[in-house]
Each structure stands twice: as C-alpha cells, then as structure tokens.
Amino acid sequence: MKEIIEKLAKFENLSGVEMTDVIERIVTGRVTEAQIASLLLALKMKGETPEERTAIAQVMRGHAQHIPTEIHDAMDNCGTGGDKSFSFNISTTAAFVLAGGGIHMAKHGNRSISSKSGSADVLEALGINLDLKPAELGKVFDKTGIVFLFAKNMHPAMKYIMPARLELGIPTIMNLTGPLIHPMALETQLLGISRPELLESTAQVLKNMGRKRAIVVAGPEGLDEAGLNGTTKIALLENGEISLSSFTPEDLGMEDYAMEDIRGGNAQENAEILLSVLKNEASPFLETTVLNAGLGFYANGKIDSIKEGVALARQVIARGKALEKLRLLQEYQK
C-alpha cells in the first residue's frame, strides 16, 4: 500500500490491475483507515483517470448486494453530490417524475456527506423504509416500478471506506464512484457531477460499465444537476459514442432562476419541497425538477430532445402521475 500511495504522490497513474488490487484489499478489511484516507487524498490531488475509476467501480459493484427483480431496463439518476449548493433534493424529486412517465426507476443514494439532506434522509422523512432486505426491495420494484436502494445497505464493503470519507469531509473518488456502482445492471442513466472537466471521462466510465445510453450533466456554479442559473454542460453516451454539448434555460424556453432560489433545508424541509413539486405548485423548485426530469427522459431515450422531455415532465406532474408514484412507494417500501 505504501508503494501505491508514493506512486500517486508523484502524480503517476495506477494501472487497472493496480487499482483493482488496492480496492480488493480495502473492501476485505486489509488496509488501515489512515491508509485509505491517504489513498483518497492522493487520488484527488493527482486526478482520477477513467481506468482507475472503472477499476474501483467494477470491484465495488462486484461486492454489492444482488436485487432479484423481473425488471431488466432499470434507470438511475443519482449524482455525485459534493457540490456545496445546499439545494433541495433535485434528482430524488425528479425520480418520481421519471417513474410517473413510465420509466423503471431504481433510485440509488445515501445519507448526506457534505450537504444538509441526502436522498436517503429526505425519503426517510417521507416514511420510506431504508432497511428492507434485497428480496423485499425486488418485490417493491416489480410492483411499483420505483424503488429506493440505500447505498449503505447495498454496499456492505463500503463500511471499510466510510469512516475515512466522513473524517475527510470533502468530495473524493468515492463521490465519483457512488453513482457508478448501482447494484442492478442499468441500461440507462442520468449522472450529475459538480466538475465539468470530468464530463467526458465519466461518460467513458459509464460506457466501460455497460450502459447503453447515458447522460453526464454538470450544471452552472458547480451544481451537479441541470440548472436554470446559467449554462449546463452534458456528455451524451449513445451507440457507443460520446458527444459534448451545452444548453441554457433560454434554449428550452424556460426562465432563469438564481441558485438562492432553489436552496433547500433539512430533511423535513426538503420533504415538504418535494411534495409541493409533485403537487404541481408553481415555484423555482418545480421548474428545476421539470428541467432535470426532462433531461432524464432524454437520457433514457424515451423522447428525442430535452425540450420534449421538459414538456413530458410537466404533463406527468400535472396529471398527478409523479405524486402517485410517491404514494405507491410509501405504501410498499415501508
């Protein structure tokens, strides 16, 4: 382990084999917490390569729980977090809209690391049981078309890494890894990151992980979602090819809103915001959700443009389909 950390300290990249060996040692409890923290910091300072990120994701996913389900076209819209925006739970709210629009949503998430409320926190506040067994979660998904997979429970091996992450208190490669290690074999994905310079490389990792179609999104002001406060950049993975583009609210016929307009609060406050959006109450929260759900519909390939996706998202919310999915999840995942 010492040799690996020294190599990273010299800003030398690890091979896929080296990274695989290191992570296998970590997730089997053979590395100290201090060494793990040193590794995470060294990788962050050097900058993580697609090969390193793919290796860690493949190892972590190999140690994940298996969710038995009859659904084979699941999608996730988990972001990396760590953007310090303190926004409401955008992707979690959008997940219900996507599910209401007919997409099988297996939302994968965790408690907050660097914000006030993570997806697990807000859903727990809404009465969702985070601790169902894998077989029970599979049944929920088959019955409702939506399920929440609590990352802490899905990845027992993460217990070896979490203390170092919490002690560091800053985004690391594990933030970048979380959305890549979904327990299910996803076909499509919308993945938010707060570092636009990683758009293309993250799309490459998704390709390496077997995604058929995906969008990696980086919003304005470091937001790890699409934003209405400036230019949003995306990388689209389609037919094995990666293309980069960007858009503004004006491009989609939407109004601008400042970051302050979408600030959230604690889990209970964010739960109230989520409910207000699904009830179609006009606000910057609603508009931001519509934008991100629209991008999700486009990432899934359900529609042919982001603008069409936004229109579909509005329709789903207005017809009560998104709220219906929340009520179903509250009924079955309890």
From Swiss-Prot:
Lineage: Bacteria, Bacillati, Bacillota, Bacilli, Lactobacillales
Catalytic activity, reaction form: N-(5-phospho-beta-D-ribosyl)anthranilate + diphosphate = 5-phospho-alpha-D-ribose 1-diphosphate + anthranilate
Function: Catalyzes the transfer of the phosphoribosyl group of 5-phosphorylribose-1-pyrophosphate (PRPP) to anthranilate to yield N-(5'-phosphoribosyl)-anthranilate (PRA).
Entry GO CC: cytosol
Highest taxon in the source lineage: Bacteria
Family of this protein: Belongs to the anthranilate phosphoribosyltransferase family.
Binding locations of anthranilate 1: G79, N110
Record-given protein name: Anthranilate phosphoribosyltransferase
GO biological process, one term: L-tryptophan biosynthetic process
Subunit structure and binding partners: Homodimer.
EC number annotated for this UniProt entry: 2.4.2.18
EC category: transferase
Residues that, per the record, bind 5-phospho-alpha-D-ribose 1-diphosphate: 79, 82-83, 87, 89-92, 107-115, 119
Chain sites annotated for binding Mg(2+) 2: D224, E225
Organism for this UniProt entry: Streptococcus pneumoniae (strain ATCC 700669 / Spain 23F-1)
Cofactor binding note: Binds 2 magnesium ions per monomer.
Cofactor(s) the record lists: Mg(2+)
Record keywords, A-Z: Amino-acid biosynthesis, Aromatic amino acid biosynthesis, Glycosyltransferase, Magnesium, Metal-binding, Transferase, Tryptophan biosynthesis
InterPro entries for the chain: Anthranilate_Pribosyl_Tfrase, Glycosyl_Trfase_fam3, Glycosyl_Trfase_fam3_N_dom, Glycosyl_Trfase_fam3_N_dom_sf, Nuc_phospho_transferase
Sequence positions that bind anthranilate 2: R165
Positions contributing to Mg(2+) 1 binding: S91, E225
Pfam family, one: Glycos_trans_3N
GO molecular function: anthranilate phosphoribosyltransferase activity; magnesium ion binding
Annotated metabolic or biological route of this protein: Amino-acid biosynthesis; L-tryptophan biosynthesis; L-tryptophan from chorismate: step 2/5
